[in-house]
Amino acid sequence: MTFQAIATHPQDWTGDTLALGLTTAAIGETLSSELQKLDQQWNGVLQELISDSEFKAKLAETTTTRIGGSIRKLILVGLGESPTTEDYRRAAAAVAKQARSFKSQTLAIAFPPSDDPAAIASAIVEGISLALYKDQRFKSEPDTASGPSSIELLGLAGQEAAIARAEQVVAGVELARQLVAAPANVVTPVTMADTAQELAAELGLELEILEADECEKRGMGAVLGVAKASDLPPKFIHLTYRPESTPRRKLAIVGKGLTFDSGGYNIKGAGSGIEMMKTDMGGAAATLGAAKAIGLIKPDVEVHFISPVTENMISGRGMHPGDILTASNGKTIEVNNTDAEGRLTLADALVFADGLGVDAIVDLATLTGACIIALGDDIAGLWSPSDDLAEQLLQAGKAAGEKLWRLPLEEPYLDGLKSPVADYKNTGPRAGGSITAALFLKQFVKHPVWAHLDVAGPVWSDKEKHYNPAGATGYGVRTLVNWVLS
């Protein structure tokens, strides 16, 4: 699938399928002057289609007809009243799915002129590419239906750089989707490390992988406590992108990487969704996806991508409820729930990131069911002691169409994590569980410019939503990239 930005006007374009994005104002009591010209050229087909289908131009609403002659199919897609970048993205996705159903080979898409044509071009590329993504690695009879092979963005000549960057971001999202969607017998700590090695070789990134013995030398008792029960070795991944010039800032992204979470001795029972615990490395997947995108884009920012990758399994040598672990900053943790293991692995990863001398740290993790209860499946939780960093992430998420909601770091809640035998317990009272999880992590990062994202809900969708097919969404990659580039 190739994208090309051209200056051609819709009335001059010829090809398989033409899509027009229309606002509600454009089809009010009378068609806009531009649409009237098209309607005259097409012998009234446009007005007839709008009237007969009762098309209202609601966001992502579509209607179609055959024109004949130089254009086989016409798609009208609604943009609503005042379209945002995310609206353009969703409208483009709706067009892509219609074009695929028509088996269109060439597609042209025209949206109204904008003050930010680069944003529109990027949104079209992202919306179409992400909507048409298919993961058929594990299908014995793959679905051969595909979308258009050639897509032209009308009226957007000169936006080649925006198209290229959007394609680079999409490549990162697709990597994250593939990692999250694959089962735990395919994606393991070992294969995650292999993926990091491939990224390093492909993109010229620096790579450091700490094996279990090195983790032990560094006092990473929290991550090693989780890893003990698995037959597969843990892999502590540290990828670094360094620009050729002096970086304008240095950042660290830390992703939780549990390739499977059985719950340990606090095993996940029936109805717990244990079969979906392959997704418990969604934070690490987004981290590696962001590494791919950043490595392709090559901004003037130094970025460290960190993920402690392991399984949380059950065996005779496994972590027991009641065990006390010592993290690499010397703080001790009473494990009162072996199924709250992600925060243990992140504890050592945050201490590691804290020692890199970066300007800001962001971690993301499929950390708590409590966050899903609070915010639902589509919204990630955000905690940060830094108002500036929180605002940066909120704006990055808004631009990406990835929803974030800031929640409080309510310090009095930390009392619920105090242990009579260690510094902290790894879980507190049931109420406010996502807040106490964030407070737990805060004990392992001294840096004041730090944020925690709980992405437990949006890394997976059971049904198709906009440009996300059912399954892994790749959530977080686009927000992280926007943040790094900001």
From Swiss-Prot:
Belongs to the peptidase M17 family. Its cofactor is Mn(2+). It is found in: Cytoplasm. One of its GO terms (biological process) is proteolysis. Its EC number is 3.4.11.1, 3.4.11.10. HAMAP family: Cytosol_peptidase_M17. Keywords: Aminopeptidase, Cytoplasm, Hydrolase, Manganese, Metal-binding, Protease. Binds 2 manganese ions per subunit. One of its GO terms (molecular function) is metalloaminopeptidase activity. It catalyses: Release of an N-terminal amino acid, Xaa-|-Yaa-, in which Xaa is preferably Leu, but may be other amino acids including Pro although not Arg or Lys, and Yaa may be Pro. Amino acid amides and methyl esters are also readily hydrolyzed, but rates on arylamides are exceedingly low; Release of an N-terminal amino acid, preferentially leucine, but not glutamic or aspartic acids. The keyword Protease applies. Gene3D superfamilies: Leucine Aminopeptidase, subunit E, domain 1, Zn peptidases. This is Probable cytosol aminopeptidase. Presumably involved in the processing and regular turnover of intracellular proteins. Catalyzes the removal of unsubstituted N-terminal amino acids from various peptides. Mn(2+) 2 binds at K256, D261, D280, E341. CDD domains: Peptidase_M17. Transmembrane segments: none annotated. Mn(2+) 1 binds at D261, D339, E341. GO terms for cellular component: cytoplasm. Pfam families: Peptidase_M17, Peptidase_M17_N. InterPro entries: Leucine_aapep/pepB, Macro_dom-like, Peptidase_M17_C, Peptidase_M17_leu_NH2_pept, Peptidase_M17_N. The gene is pepA. It comes from Synechococcus sp. (strain ATCC 27144 / PCC 6301 / SAUG 1402/1) (Anacystis nidulans). The active site is at K268, R343. Its main location: cytoplasm.
